[in-house]
Amino acid sequence: MFEGAIGHFDCALVTNCQNLRNIIFRGSVSSTGGQGFAHNCPKLDSVIFESTVVYFDLDLLKDSKCPNLTKYIRHGVFLKVYNNKIASIADIDYLKSNPRLIKDLKKTAQWQAQILTAKNSDWMRSNEYQSARILYPVLKALNSKEADTLKAAMNYAWSLGDEVKTKLDILKESPKYNSEPPFDMAFRYAEPSDRMLRMTRKKFNLDKIAGNGDDISRMKNLLYWVHDNIEHDGSNGLAPGARNLENTYESARRNSCGYNCRALAICLTEALLAVGIPARYITCISKGWETDNDCHVICIAWSKSLNKWVWVDPTFAAYVTDENGIMLHPGEVLYRLQHDLPLILDEEANWNNRVKQTADYYLKEYMAKNIYFLETNIWNQAEPEGENNHPQGKTVTLVPVGLTYPHANYNTSDEKWFWQTPL
């Protein structure tokens, strides 16, 4: 039994308790983290929260070795939950009728305010800011004076920089693009008659895979084919040898392994080019690239029927549409994220056919972080990089006004030029 208030707990809090049957939290909890809560507690059948939890971010894992634990029991209040199938949210009317729970929420707010204004609280400040975002409007609705104190602490934490901001917050604050004088160059795309593309097209029978439908149908078929035939393994880098579809595919088969998002994007780009669909792969880079070495690589494909580029991501079998089902390109997705406009992630989006993706995570967290800078090749062809016997292109990065990405050959803030129609 936990008697007092808890600020935050994370990951497996209870492990290897063979005779433990129940856990009770008597006091309030500001936030939880991690999907695993208990591990190897075979007799555990109930976890009860008797007070308030601002953000309940727990799930029930099949491999937790707690076979009898099938739900969490709420006797108090959850203000926000990660999975509403295993825990429900209490409404404000229920809260207003329970002075004890209101008192506990006020104590949580006081603790959050201390964390937000403390020195050297870094990670905890960032975590509790997100929890405070949930609690503040509730306190406001209750006409609690603690709401003003908490808001002041939140404003102070925000003023310190990006520390407490979500990836979407940072993206919304990014400088805008402008229209510069265009480069004296245009993007180039290898024709299907290119020798290497003809070989790829024939070897994999890509015309049959793409099918006889419209251009959207054909690019989706190729997207799913690459996704289903080459697993993603971000830790395994690129396939040894040539950076092309044939070598990556054969290496993955031969070694029973996957490769990183860049490898998959190179493969899909080559497949699209081989059937006559102009395509580029885009390296999506975070604002904090100097310390954040995680980026993500997707593809864009030119749709004649829509007269624009569209987003296709072979790592997650993902594409993105607006509220009318029209496929979008990364620039349109970025704009809609910045302006809170509807974004729909396709229902099939998943990782390695094992983990389903959601718009909240994939777009508003993962890609919101990674579409601050967008880098692409000017010359798009089979084997676009690595050691080979044909000329390599240069890279250009689309950057917000006033910023540069030094690893690109060129930088531009002219988004119209970046998304130009293929010649």
Please identify what each model-predicted range represents.
Residues 125-142:
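Amphipathic, non-membrane alpha-helical rod segments
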Residues 11-13, 35-37, 60:
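Consensus positions within tandem repeat domains that build extended binding/scaffold surfaces
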Residues 234-298, 302:
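Active-site neighborhood of thiol-dependent amide/isopeptide-bond enzymes
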Residues 1-8, 16-31, 42-55, 64-93, ...:
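Structural signature of tandem-repeat unit edges
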Residues 215-220, 273-280, 305-309:
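Loop/turn elements at helix/coil->beta-strand transitions in domains of secreted/extracellular proteins
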Residues 158-259:
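Secondary-structure boundary elements
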Residues 291, 301-423:
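His-Asp-centered catalytic microenvironments across diverse enzyme cores
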